[in-house]
């Protein structure tokens, strides 16, 4: 089977490094002013560290794509013109774009940089792909609404351009994210297409008849209301072979605002799946679907990949992300046979935990917990820095993470 690119999100420099070390061939990143994500303070890539981020990716042997897919107003264009020199100096391997004004500036000031056409352009057919190819794009990121058979038809008719497709992550209830609900419900304060969506599709709704304004009716038999607009998360790990056979060149995971653990665990799972498929095209991928249940999700669906979406693709009683396993701690150092960790969720002496690293994955037991003063304690609380001893320790603790073992039963697939 031919090699394809595993493309992971990079919300900051740390996530960028973990994504690559856990298996990504490329990362996509953006700065707040020009990409469709509003990052939390302290977790952003800025104009000042953008070059460092791209250089780090290159040092680790991966590509870095700069996301400039904002729908730009006049003031955005003016800001982009002022920033274009630093963007160019960062030397990204490509820029991801959707707005024609932004595209025009990139072609003018960064003519040697490849153009990747964002999924925000809703590219659904081969004529659109031909248009972007003739316009000078080197890659089109296809709309999530395409079935695999449609991708194959596009590839058959347009063989001379790269195709990128989403394989995992949150989905917008609107066509490829072009939603106005957030803007409407927040009186223009939180625009989805400027990276600040309030996610009204995740809110709980009840039915009201106009002549009975004080009577609220449940849409579903659930005391919390019905999340009728909330789509499940996309998961196509069991359909990687079909996507590759259809002609996809890059497999993309959503999630620049997701956690370090999420990015690492998802990258590792898809890397292992792709590596096994390369050795055996008949390999059973279901074990990787089970593995992906250990990260945050709203239940899984194949979306439009196998044909039309169905009611089962929506989460009627899940509005917030859940996880089949809890992220417990990350490794920060070593002293003799003890490991310094930062705790993310409470741990106890003798707990069994699962440790993952870029090259390992195993279950072990916590044999000792000590605080920084060397005092033994029966547990460690969230945000504590403690020293741990294990029944079995990782061969290389750098970039190691730990989580609970087992998978909760709520996760579903449509």
Question: Regions from the language model: what does each represent?
Answer:
Residues 1-22, 26-38, 53-54, 60-70, ...:
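Surface-exposed amphipathic alpha-helical tracts and adjacent flexible/coil segments at the periphery
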Residues 62-131:
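N-terminal active-site wall of soluble small-molecule enzyme domains
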């Amino acid at each position: 089977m031919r090699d394809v690119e595993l493309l992971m999100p990079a919300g900051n420099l740390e996530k960028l490094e973990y994504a690559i070390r856990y298996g990504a061939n490329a990362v996509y990143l953006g700065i707040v002013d020009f990409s469709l994500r509003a990052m939390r303070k302290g977790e952003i890539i800025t104009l000042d560290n953008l070059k460092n981020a791209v250089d780090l990716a290159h040092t680790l042997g991966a590509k870095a794509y700069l996301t400039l897919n904002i729908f730009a107003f006049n003031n955005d264009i003016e800001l982009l013109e002022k920033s274009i020199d630093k963007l160019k100096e960062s030397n990204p391997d490509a820029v991801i774009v959707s707005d024609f004004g932004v595209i025009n500036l990139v072609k003018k000031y960064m003519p040697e940089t490849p153009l990747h056409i964002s999924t925000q352009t809703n590219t659904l057919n081969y004529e659109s792909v031909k248009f972007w190819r003739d316009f000078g794009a080197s890659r089109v990121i296809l709309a999530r609404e395409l079935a695999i058979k449609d991708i194959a038809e596009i590839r058959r008719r347009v063989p001379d351009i790269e195709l990128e497709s989403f394989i995992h992550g949150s989905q917008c209830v609107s066509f490829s994210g072009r939603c106005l609900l957030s803007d409407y419900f927040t009186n223009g304060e939180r625009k989805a297409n400027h990276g600040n969506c309030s996610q009204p599709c995740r809110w709980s709704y009840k039915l009201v008849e106009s002549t009975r304004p004080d009577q609220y009716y449940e849409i579903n038999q659930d005391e919390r209301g019905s999340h009728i607009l909330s789509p499940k998360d996309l998961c196509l790990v069991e359909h990687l072979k079909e996507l590759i056979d259809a002609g996809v060149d890059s497999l993309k995971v959503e999630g620049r605002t997701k956690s370090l653990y999420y990015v690492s665990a998802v990258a590792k799972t898809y890397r292992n799946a792709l590596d096994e498929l390369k050795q055996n095209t008949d390999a059973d991928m279901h074990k990787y679907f089970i593995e992906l249940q250990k990260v945050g999700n709203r239940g899984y669906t194949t979306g439009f990949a196998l044909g039309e979406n169905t009611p089962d693709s929506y989460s009627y009683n899940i509005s917030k992300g859940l996880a089949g396993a809890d992220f417990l701690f990350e490794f920060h150092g070593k002293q003799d046979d003890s490991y310094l960790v930062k705790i993310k969720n409470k741990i106890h002496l003798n707990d069994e935990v699962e440790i993952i690293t870029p090259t390992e994955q195993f279950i072990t037991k916590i044999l000792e917990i000590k605080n920084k003063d060397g005092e033994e304690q029966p547990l460690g609380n969230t945000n504590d820095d403690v020293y741990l001893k294990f029944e079995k320790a990782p061969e290389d603790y750098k970039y190691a993470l730990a989580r609970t073992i087992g998978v909760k039963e709520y996760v579903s697939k449509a």
